Amino acid sequence: MDLSTLAAFALFVAVMTGTPGPGNLTFMAIGATSGYRTAFPVIVASQLGSLVLNLCVAFGLGQVMAEGGPLVTVFKVLSMTYMAYLAWRIVSLSIKPKGDVRLPSFWEGILIHPLSPKTWAMSLVAFTTFFAGNGLALGENAALLTGGLLIGGTIAHSIWALVGVSILAVLGDGPLLRATTITMAGGMLAATAWAMLL
C-alpha cells in the first residue's frame, strides 16, 4: 500500500468515524447525562465489537452481507430492535432519577457496532476501496483496516462524549437536557433507519 492510498484511507476514517451515527450519538447522550467517566468503558466495549466486525469483513463475511438475502433481513431486524432499545436506555438516563436507572453496561456497548448498519457499510466500503487486490497479505490488510478504524472510532467517540459533557455543563440537569437527550435518541434511530436505506 503506497502512502497516498494510506492517506486517503486515513481521511476516509476521519470523516466516517467523525460523522453522526448510532455510536457517536449514543456516546454524546451518555456524556450529556452521565459524564465521560461513564461513557469511556462503553466506548472501549464498542471498539471491541467494532474490532470483531472489521475482522469478519476482512475475512469474508462482508462479501456475504453485500450479496443480500435472508441474513441481511435478519440483521436489519436485529439492528433496528437493538437501536430502539438503546434509544430507550438513553432517554431513561435523563427522565428517571439518577439512582433509579442502570447505566449502560460494557456488554451493551459491545453490540453497538456489530448491529450498526453505518459501521457495516463503512467497513465494507473501506475494505473494498483501499484493501481488496492491493497485493498485501490478508492478515496485513485486516490489521490495517481494524487498526485504522479502531483508532478513528476511539477518538471520534471520545470527542462526541466530551461534546455531551459540554452540553450537560451548559444546559444543566433539567428539562432542556431531557429534551436534548430525547432528540439525540431520535436522531440515533433516524440515522440507523437512513443507513439501512443506503
Role assignments for model-derived ranges:
Residues 14-15, 48, 84, 110, ...:
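Hydrophobic residues within the alpha-helical transmembrane core of Major Facilitator Superfamily
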Residues 92-105:
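Flexible cytoplasmic inter-helical loops of multi-pass small-molecule transporters
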Residues 23, 49-61, 83-86, 120, ...:
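Alpha-helical transmembrane segments and their lipid-water interface positions
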Residues 3-70, 125-145, 149:
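Juxtamembrane transmembrane-helix termini in multi-pass membrane transport proteins
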Residues 54-58, 115-128, 186-198:
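Hydrophobic alpha-helical transmembrane segments in multi-pass integral membrane proteins
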Residues 66-95, 150, 156-160, 170-198:
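Selective transmembrane alpha-helices of multi-pass membrane proteins
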Residues 141-165:
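Hydrophobic alpha-helical transmembrane segments of multi-pass membrane transport proteins
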